[in-house]
Amino acid sequence: MTKSELIERIVTHQGLLSSKDVELAIKTMLEQMSQCLATGDRIEIRGFGSFSLHYRAPRVGRNPKTGQSVSLDGKFVPHFKPGKELRDRVNEDEEEGV
C-alpha cells in the first residue's frame, strides 16, 4: 500500500475529514516520526510496534558489477519490531486464508 492509497482508504472509511486533511495528518505524522528517529529516539505505538535505530558495523562489501571489494562505513538503519497485537492479527488473518 502506498501513502496515497492509505489516504484514500482512510477518507473512504471515515467521512468526516477531507482528503487534504488526512493527507496533511499523515505527512505530519511521518515527518515527526522521521525527526524522532533522526535524533536517535525510539518510537513505540502500543499494539502496533516500535521503531528504533540499529547500528550496522563497517564491513567490506562487493561491487556487483565489477566484483571489486568496497569498504563500507558503519551506519544507523531504521528498524521496526511489530507488537504482539499486530503479530497476532497477521497470523490470525493468515490462518483464515487472507
UniProtKB/Swiss-Prot annotation:
Q: Which domain of life is it from?
A: Bacteria
Record Pfam families: Bac_DNA_binding (PF00216)
Q: Name one GO biological process term.
A: regulation of DNA-templated transcription
Q: Which CDD domains match?
A: IHF_B (cd13836)
Cite the GO molecular-function annotations of the record: DNA binding; structural constituent of chromatin
Its Gene Ontology cellular component terms are:
chromosome; cytosol
Which HAMAP family does this one have? IHF_beta
Question: What's the protein here called?
Answer: Integration host factor subunit beta
> Does the entry feature the keyword DNA-binding, yes or no?
yes
Subunit arrangement?
Heterodimer of an alpha and a beta chain.
Q: What family name appears in the similarity comment? A: Belongs to the bacterial histone-like protein family.
The record's function comment reads: This protein is one of the two subunits of integration host factor, a specific DNA-binding protein that functions in genetic recombination as well as in transcriptional and translational control.
Task: Name the source organism.
Answer: Pseudomonas fluorescens (strain SBW25)
Give the UniProt keywords, A-Z: DNA recombination, DNA-binding, Transcription, Transcription regulation, Translation regulation
Determine if Transcription regulation is one of this entry's keywords. yes
Identify the PROSITE patterns for this entry: HISTONE_LIKE
